[in-house]
Amino acid sequence: MKTIVVSAPGKIHFLGEHAVVYGKPAFLAAINKRIFVTISETRQKKIDDLLLEELKKVIEHAIKKKYKSFKSSPYSISISSDIPIGSGLGSSAALSAALTLALLTFLGIHDDKTTIFDIAYTGESFFHGNPSGGDLATVIEGGLLWYRKEFDFLKIFTHLLFKPHKNIGQFILINSGKPKESTKDMVEKVSQLKIASPQKTQALFDSQEELTKQMVILLKDGDEDSLIECIKLGERNLEKLGVVGEKAQSLIRVIERLGGAAKINGGGGFKEGSGMLLVYHKDVERLLNYAKQKNLEVLKIKIGAEGLRRDE
């Protein structure tokens, strides 16, 4: 019987989250944590996860709309992943992309990345309501990505073909706790702030745009001191947007006192945890030792991983 295996990576946001929803650029990278989707031909369709069943229906509907039909033999879907869920690492984008490619492949449809993006975007919207598309573009393309959503119908990205300078050490992720809110909730929170304080919010978005541009240059040129300062400033703006809770802020201040910098990585969270923090320090071992002492969850990552792919 036919079996299809597809995988997609998680992602990090160097800078630009939330502002990217409003037409500002985001700088992202795929990481070496992946989700695997396996579709197997079977005599009877079987999907145990209700959320996955709903997502499958959304993507199937998009495929039917595009290709005017959806005829297949019965199949089962299984998922395995080492991307933490609900921590800002793009698990929903990775799942939407991998499931889309797996279904298209199972149906014998071979299409380009633009079509895969458009179909998978309906799945990402199922999770987040009005996603920018940046996470999805990154997990499909892989590597480092510069992304900007001009309009719903115009999403522009550039695959950055450089690697971080040799002076730049290892980024790590430290878990500040799982957010109580969904990414959709946090996007709505920023939307309400923009309505209540449009000038303040726009100024923060403008600042994030300049810092995001600086981040690209700093990673390319290898200026560690300026990189740390850039991360700090970007994080302060995110705090002013109201997407970083006290728990995460306290941990970030400790990391700064140790000589490093940290920021949320995605939608964030306010009431409890804010998900995985993207952390940088010239002496990463110092941070690892601190995290070990405090029993904090740490993920070591490699930046610039391969994007969406068929594994079997």
Indicate residue ranges for each PLM-predicted region:
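DPxDG-like acidic metal-binding loop motif
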Residues: 87-110, 143
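C-terminal nucleotide
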Residues: 2-15, 20-21, 28, 36-71, ...
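Short alpha-helical patches at coil-to-helix transitions and adjacent helical residues
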Residues: 11, 93-97, 134
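Glycine/charged-rich beta-loop-alpha catalytic/anionic-binding loops adjacent to active sites
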Residues: 73-85
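Short, charged, amphipathic alpha-helices and their helix-cap/turn boundaries
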Residues: 114-116
